[in-house]
Amino acid sequence: MNNLKIKLKENFGFSSFKNLQEPIINNLINGNHSFVILPTGGGKSLCYQLPALYLDGIAIVISPLIALMKNQVDLIRGNNSDESIAHVLNSSLTKNQIEEVKSDITNGKTKIVFIAPETLTKKETIAFLSKSSISFLAIDEAHCISEWGHDFRPEYRKIREIFDQIKPDITIIALTATATPKVQDEIIKNLKIDNGKVYKSSFNRPNLYYEIRSKSNETNLDLIKFINSNKNKSGIIYCLSRKQVEELSELLNINRIKSLPYHAGLDKKIRDKNQDKFLKDECDVIVATIAFGMGIDKPDVRFVIH
């Protein structure tokens, strides 16, 4: 068994890689740029998490959502005895917490840091990272770079120019599950990774079943019947408005279906608590706006309703 597979088993509990993970990881470890386009559930996160633990220094991961960062940090910490191995740097932290994170990084305790793009643009963040030993840069949900993408974030377009100040020769891995050829070209151009290797696998998901139903006058009753026919199975229901989220979640609970709401109008502590309960199977259904879901790693979700 090679060193990578030993690390894989020790830190993630897997005996073998799947899909394109191994060549992607080897390419990154060898100091080459990578652009990774894999479907949801294709194992993108491991492509930077394992190299972060394998290489010297700290890996910087740019991630667009606080919920997504927290989910990934919790998963990495869950497989390691030392919680300081992974941290987040975003607006959810107090000044004292930020100083603790920086101390762990400076003392070499931390191997991977998830940073919000808005936090990255701050002068103090740039100054601190310029003095840190960085192994590589990972850009998760890289489609946020593109003005043509459905999740465009202006701060994502500044990542490359910021790292030109911090570490101009940094190795970059950009990852997405959703990018048209036009968006792919824009990502590559913006990050200046024209000489990198592109990894793309099939997006055919034979294990998924899609169904479109006409809405009846009894939509809520239909929902309750469907969920009850999938008793004790995890599911996500997406609504267009916060009001719909709250009303539907309340209705499900009245009908003895363990449900929690999630939307940007809720206090952050409540959002985090509801997400944790869903991930820990303390509720069956999360009712949410599109604020929830990008990158959430829950292997037993059995239905998604829009």
Regions found by a protein language model. Name each.
Residues 1-4:
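Accessory DNA-binding and partner-docking regions appended to nucleic-acid-acting proteins
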Residues 6-11, 15-19, 23-35, 39-45, ...:
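Helicase motor core with emphasis on the C-terminal RecA-like subdomain
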Residues 67:
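Conserved Rossmann-like nucleotide-cofactor binding loop
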